[in-house]
């Protein structure tokens, strides 16, 4: 019985940590990415018409956390390289992946 209670508490703390990561990710995304991307759900278009919305990114077929890590750490045309800590990057990725329609 103690083992089950421990597992329930462990799972609950993991869910809480994920929610906090996403909240932090939303803050970082707004500050760092919001100039070009529509960061929040409900924003129909990005300020930069060539930049996808975060909802579009999250729902791109095959999109994974690993793919977003590559995108955020590899220079590519049209997107500046931001200096983010690993934790900041992971929080932004958690936020984007949390926007997936079929979680």
What are the residue ranges of the model-derived segments?
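Sec-dependent N-terminal signal peptides
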Residues: 4-13
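Electrostatic cytochrome c docking/interface patches
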Residues: 14-28
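Short sequence/structural segments immediately N-terminal
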Residues: 28, 102-103
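The canonical Cys-X-X-Cys-His
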Residues: 32-40, 92
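Short, non-ligating residues that shape and space the ligands of small metal-coordination modules
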Residues: 42-43, 63
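Axial heme c-ligation environment in periplasmic c-type cytochrome domains
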Residues: 49-57, 69-100
């Amino acid at each position: 019985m103690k083992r089950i209670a421990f597992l329930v508490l462990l799972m609950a703390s993991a869910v809480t940590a994920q929610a906090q990561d996403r909240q932090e990710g939303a803050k970082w995304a707004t500050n760092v990415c919001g100039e070009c991307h529509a960061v929040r759900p409900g924003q129909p278009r990005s300020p930069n018409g060539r930049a996808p919305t975060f909802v579009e990114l999250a729902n791109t077929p095959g999109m994974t956390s690993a793919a977003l890590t590559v995108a955020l750490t590899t220079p590519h045309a049209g997107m500046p390289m931001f200096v983010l800590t690993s934790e900041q990057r992971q929080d932004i990725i958690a936020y984007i992946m949390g926007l997936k329609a079929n979680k």
